[in-house]
Amino acid sequence: MEADFVIIGSGSAGSAMAYRLSEDGRYSVIVIEYGVPDVGPLIQMPAALSFPMNMETYDWGFSTEPEPHIGGRSLVTPRGKVLGGSSSINGMVYVRGHARDYDHWSESGARGWAYADVLPYFKRMENSSGGQEGWRGTNGPLYIQRGKRDNPLFHAFVEAGHEAGFEVTEDYNGEKQEGFGPMEQTIHNGRRWSAANAYLKPALKRPNVKLVKGLARKIVLEGKRAVGVEIEAGRSFSTIRARREVIIAASSINSPKLLMLSGIGPAAQLKEHGIEVVADRPGVGQNLQDHLEVYIQQECTQPITLYSKLNLFSKAKIGAEWLFFKTGDGATNHFESAAFLRSKAGVEYPDIQYHFLPVAIRYDGKAAAQSHGFQAHVGPMRSKSRGSVTLRSANPREKPVIKFNYMSHEDDWADFRHCVRLTREIFGQAAFNPYRGAEIQPGAHVQSDDEIDNFIKEHVESAFHPCGTCKMGAVDDPMAVVDAECRVIGVEGLRVADSSIFPRITNGNLNGPSIMVGEKASDHILGRTPLARSDQEPWINPRWQVSDR
């Protein structure tokens, strides 16, 4: 079996590349996917989002090694093992990231990935409803919507931010990210609008695209050129040949793992596992980054939250309405208000993100208290902590060793203390007076730095945004894995294009930026001239040097 291009992974970037590389019919594409089909309400119903990421059917089941700076806790690292990859199990929140994130990419060695370069690709991929005119795409495959925001708590959150002196923004994905405003969702006609729905399924209707189920074991190399992929399907092994290129889009966990299994990575580590070294790239698996967050929860004095919908009868009613009509409480992820804020004067652009929910709920989807409540998910966006993904063995079926080194930089603790206190300030504004009850978490007794630190150590969780393990950079950067056209340095015919190539984590959720990577990488792979650079300038708070708001 062979094709012009062989893509490993049907996730956010992989699906986009399958669509674009096959678009004009000149080239054949094979997509290798180990996961299951994305069928059923647990995947497609937006409100069911807490289920697929906690089910081994749809998730690779990764977790970290015990993290020493948060009391030895091991945190889960969900990655989608399903058509659409993590875009089929995520929270459906759409965030481009801030313009300065991409300017930093370019300045750090990823030339051609500044905001002016990537904005045209965001526009090409978007089909935005309600976004800022002139800044958003309206004809792309990826549908983006805003929720109805029919719960008054969503508006109280935004008004409270305004009362506290912060900016308000009507479109954080437009000219102005900073401020409080509506959150955007990858939902269309009441369904999760994953990369599979947006890109892969339309591509699979073309005669030049084929989906192959199997586990990618290693890249097949002839000398220093990639010529195919060895896969395992059932108990049989086979090789899929690539006439032109192999493209890895297997996630920030599996992409570096696959490179290392193929002899591309830190030489000493490869030799330790008996793997022949093809290219000594010490950066493979390094530079691992993520966003962490905590939940700040309040009781609500009015019975207007989703707490009343958590009983079995209400869930059945919600499910039935969604199954028959794709409407109602099942047709939203319930993340409908958000904020991007700067932590202090001297910070040029937002470094704190908020998701607001009109319910107080735990990570497993159960009520945090036997009462009505609401909560904010809050965390810093640019932690200095860095981790790694390394091989546990040379067995492709064995999970890698994942160490994020969460909270290992002293700034992380100060940042999170500020997040907790800032959220209390926001919840204490007059806009919440009609609704605010007692604080559920951390609790009113948690006040001092030590008390807040202990709360963080026990309760901080991943926002599930791992990235950076195959860093894009200049070819003379010893820690770069791919160049600015996503080509693996030192190997021909091989690229990586997914969130693993991010030099630094972007400001917000990563599905949107990962799809953008797939879009832009496609033009590089096809040898096309990149889309014309944008001359639009993002809004930067004129008071950023003297005020945090």
From Swiss-Prot:
Reactions listed under catalytic activity: choline + A = betaine aldehyde + AH2; betaine aldehyde + NAD(+) + H2O = glycine betaine + NADH + 2 H(+)
GO molecular function: betaine-aldehyde dehydrogenase (NAD+) activity; choline dehydrogenase activity; flavin adenine dinucleotide binding
InterPro entries, alphabetized: BetA (IPR011533), FAD/NAD-bd_sf (IPR036188), GMC_OxRdtase (IPR012132), GMC_OxRdtase_N (IPR000172), GMC_OxRtase_C (IPR007867)
Active site: residue positions: 465
Class of this enzyme: oxidoreductase
GO terms (BP aspect): glycine betaine biosynthetic process from choline
Residue numbers binding FAD: 4-33
Catalytic activity, EC: 1.1.99.1, 1.2.1.8
Cofactor: FAD
Keyword list, A-Z: FAD, Flavoprotein, NAD, Oxidoreductase
SUPFAM superfamilies given in the database record: FAD-linked reductases, C-terminal domain, FAD/NAD(P)-binding domain
Keyword hit for NAD: yes
Disulphide connectivity of cysteines: none
Pathway: Amine and polyamine biosynthesis; betaine biosynthesis via choline pathway; betaine aldehyde from choline (cytochrome c reductase route): step 1/1
Role: Involved in the biosynthesis of the osmoprotectant glycine betaine. Catalyzes the oxidation of choline to betaine aldehyde and betaine aldehyde to glycine betaine at the same rate.
Family: Belongs to the GMC oxidoreductase family.
Name recorded for this polypeptide: Oxygen-dependent choline dehydrogenase
Lineage of the species this protein comes from: Bacteria, Pseudomonadati, Pseudomonadota, Alphaproteobacteria, Hyphomicrobiales
Gene: betA
